[in-house]
A protein has these predicted regions:
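Histidine/lysine/aspartate-rich catalytic loop segments that bind and position anionic ligands
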Residues: 136-159
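Short acidic alpha-helix initiation/capping motifs at coil-to-helix transition points
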Residues: 26-29, 69-70, 90-94, 125-130, ...
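Alpha-helical scaffolds flanking conserved acidic
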Residues: 108-116, 193-196
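A short structural micro-motif
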Residues: 98-99, 121-125, 155-157, 175, ...
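Secretory/endomembrane lumenal or extracellular ectodomains immediately following the signal peptide
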Residues: 1-112, 223-258
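Short, thiol/selenol-centered motifs that function as redox-active sites or metal-ligating centers
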Residues: 113-135, 147, 201-204, 208
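Preference for long, well-ordered alpha-helical segments
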Residues: 191-242
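Acidic/histidine-rich alpha-helical segments that form the ligand environment
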Residues: 161-199
């Protein structure tokens, strides 16, 4: 059963703001959402990219159990904006798919990515990105106490394995990852793993910025308060089993479509 007051549901109202939320008391200005470009204005390759991204967004929607059976599919506002440049939209989507399928390729697993994401909670500019990652991390067993410790820079309380991943992500974000730290990580995880982890952190930071900007230009304001709501809900055991986005299901679908 969908809890309409849950932080997950509030986030979906932002992520998919162009769905018909009228019965939920939300009133978004439809005129602010960027329409998909006129196909006749695109080159053949741009039309191919547009179709690829729309099909990918449809697969993603099909893996959102809280909304897929209630609403008709629409391209989410983020990709509605990115698709003004179809090639950019496809490159961005393919980058995300590359990281979400990392486990199948033998590099980062879901828990690895979750700790890298939690390391960025105090550093990102977009509350929505942080909150979504917190919901995923909580589902994997990362506690609210651990997330708060990262927010408060009390990294010494983290388990050694988690601390290594948090230190890596924050060093990348701050531009301080040096040769010694890189070599130590590479000797434990493998050079390919570390390079992909660096790429993932950079992608996450970029995603937080571009998501925030492309939402704002379409009149969607999330605000940082949802981060505190999500952590409180996790601490109080209120997140439950509500899954905003079945990442593993999407990853399987993505690999099948390759």
């Amino acid at each position: 059963m969908m809890d309409k007051e849950s932080p997950q549901f509030k986030m979906l109202k932002l992520t998919l703001a162009n769905l018909d939320w009228e019965d939920e008391g939300e009133a978004w200005d439809d005129s602010a959402f960027l329409p998909l470009p006129d196909r006749e204005s695109l080159t053949d390759s741009e039309r191919e990219d547009l179709d690829w991204v729309v099909a990918r967004d449809r697969r993603k929607f099909a893996n959102m159990p809280m909304v897929r059976d209630r609403f008709d599919f629409r391209v989410a506002p983020l990709f509605g904006a990115l698709l003004q440049s179809p090639r950019l939209a496809r490159l961005w989507a393919e980058s995300g798919d590359f990281f979400i399928t990392a486990k199948a390729r033998g590099t980062m697993n879901e828990m690895d990515r979750a700790w890298l994401d939690m390391a960025l909670v105090p550093l990102l500019v977009n509350g929505w990105v942080q909150s979504g990652n917190i919901a995923v991390a909580g589902g994997l067993g990362i506690t609210a106490e651990a997330i708060e410790a990262i927010r408060q820079d009390r990294l010494d309380v983290l388990a050694p394995e988690a601390r290594k991943l948090v230190d890596l992500a924050q060093a990348v974000a701050r531009g301080t990852l040096g040769a010694d730290q890189f070599k130590a990580l590479a000797s434990e995880y493998g050079t390919k793993w570390v390079v992909e982890a660096i790429g993932y952190v950079v992608f996450r930071i970029g995603s937080a910025i571009i998501d925030s900007v492309l939402w704002q230009v379409q009149g969607i304001e999330g605000g940082p308060h949802i981060v505190d709501e999500m952590i409180t809900a996790l601490a109080e055991g209120r997140l439950g089993q509500q899954n905003m986005f079945d990442k593993e299901g999407f990853a399987r679908d993505r690999l099948k479509s390759s």
